[in-house]
Amino acid sequence: MEGRVNALSNINDLELHNFLVDPNFDQFINLIRGDHQTIDENPVLDFDLGPLQNSPCFIDENQFIPTPVDDLFDELPDLDSNVAESFRSFDGDSVRAGGEEDEEDYNDGDDSSATTTNNDGTRKTKTDRSRTLISERRRRGRMKDKLYALRSLVPNITKMDKASIVGDAVLYVQELQSQAKKLKSDIAGLEASLNSTGGYQEHAPDAQKTQPFRGINPPASKKIIQMDVIQVEEKGFYVRLVCNKGEGVAPSLYKSLESLTSFQVQNSNLSSPSPDTYLLTYTLDGTCFEQSLNLPNLKLWITGSLLNQGFEFIKSFT
């Protein structure tokens, strides 16, 4: 231990060993140059230290073994106490700190890889957003095309915005539905009137079918013996009809009168002046008639209504 202290004291004095004084200096030079002739099998082990054995630098046998750190700093007599404490604090914590720094560097590498993963996720999110925007643009384009087609079908468009186009289309559809309902009701009324008219007209063919069985010239079931039409006002007329009696004659007379819907019937009277005839008189007001009205035209209207009910005229009317 004393030899170690002497060695450290020599180190602290910063004194250099003068190898020029040593007798083995020439031998060192020869070894470096390679001029030695006889070399033993292990020249290092056979090397004669000589005076170097007593040198202060090679006192301890374990001089090449590293001295423990605690013993080294415990044997520092000339150092300041603060400096010695600082050396003593150098222990495994510093090593662990260094290891932790290395671990942090490694973790930084992991964080960078995680960042790369996050970047990939961000790229995927951006790609999804771009696809969503493209699909939304296509959907809006299709909607615009459909709105333009709808606008071309609707006749009355108030404004060119989307809400106005849809609202006008709804109103137009509702109007078409109301017109369809009205037309259906009109068609139903016409069918009912045609069915009723056709029922009465079927009697004439039946009568014609039965005529061969009655005889060659059977008497007609409905005959107009006389018809007089007189104009009493500008659009007022008086009508007088004489016909034979028979089954269903009186109802047919009134049905022919009801068929004159373009005129207003002011009064009517049905009487029987003789056992074989009926007398029907009535007055018509043609103020509601839109077309030009005169006496010949009125006679044609009345004649047509009677013919539709199956009447026959025996002689020309006046």
UniProtKB/Swiss-Prot annotation:
Top-level lineage group: Eukaryota
Keyword Ribonucleoprotein attached: no
Matches recorded under InterPro entries: bHLH_dom, HLH_DNA-bd_sf, TF_AMS/ICE1/BHLH6-like
UniProt entry keywords in alphabetical sequence: DNA-binding, Nucleus, Transcription, Transcription regulation
UniProt-annotated location(s): Nucleus
Region described as Disordered: spans on this chain: 90-138
Biased composition (Basic and acidic residues): 121-136
GO cellular component, one term: nucleus
Oligomeric and partner information: Homodimer.
Protein name as it appears in the record: Transcription factor FER-LIKE IRON DEFICIENCY-INDUCED TRANSCRIPTION FACTOR
The organism of origin for this protein: Arabidopsis thaliana
Gene: FIT
